[in-house]
Amino acid sequence: RGYGRKTKGFIAASAGSTAAELGDEPMMYHLRFADIQVYVGENRAAALERIFNGSNVPDVVVMDDGYQHRGVDASFKILLTTFNDPFTADYLLPAGGLRESKSGYWRADCIVITGFPDAQDDQERKRWLESIQPLPHQQVFFSKMVYGDAVSFGGKELGSDRTFTNAVAFAGIANPAAFFKQVNSCSENITEISFPDHHNFLRQELVSMVANASDQTTFVTTEKDFVRLKCNGLLDVFQNVRACYIPITIRLNDAP
């Protein structure tokens, strides 16, 4: 869809695309994975028709947030559920966060438990399988978020050990707790600043944040927030300080 973008309609990512045009998450995919095509469009069916009638027809289209999309019947459906808030323990709106009955899980070809704290714990994974009770046609995977080494914004160089004496960790994502925990693990002192999800940073709020910090401070953010800062021309605010983002990858493990 391109949530948070300032445009409408079908757009194919290109060399000149920005987060304002595509949305921050599609823009991040576009920058990180140069060998894939990225498209946004609020009308999924119309967008797919444009893609498959185009000159560069893909073998596979991955549609974000498409499990409950009524206008497109995907040939392979992936259901994500979080370790801390599994659908098996949730309820329908407004009592809980589910948009349909739990029984709707039967449509999934693949179920992924995200944020699994220890993907090597077979006993814990077996307990999850008993809770989900996957059907014969369903595969189950357990995923874990893995943080990479901090990447400098390009101003003052980071220390070779990538640890921080003082850190200001700032993020405009939905659930920043894991990010703050990661920064805390490599910092002696940390100040946490949380913004709303998909927040469009204002130059003045960033200037104030930098001005109020000590000379020993390192500013740390997420890769998604870095993309917004870069596309909005705000990286110059950090040119005379140490600033970096922490990339993530997702590790998948099969069910036991």
Task: Report each predicted region and the residues it spans.
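Short active-site-adjacent structural elements
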Residues: 178, 201-203, 227-232, 252-255
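Phosphate-bearing ligand-interacting subdomains
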Residues: 210-233
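Short, polar loop motifs at secondary-structure junctions
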Residues: 1-2, 65-68, 176, 223-227
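Hydrophobic residues at beta-strand termini and immediately following loops
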Residues: 39, 81, 143, 193, ...
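Short beta->alpha linker loops
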Residues: 42-44, 145, 174, 224
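Phosphate/Mg2+-binding loops and adjacent switch elements
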Residues: 2-135
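Short, flexible loop segments at boundaries between secondary-structure elements
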Residues: 196-200, 238-256
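C-terminal accessory "lid"/substrate-recognition subdomains
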Residues: 86-218
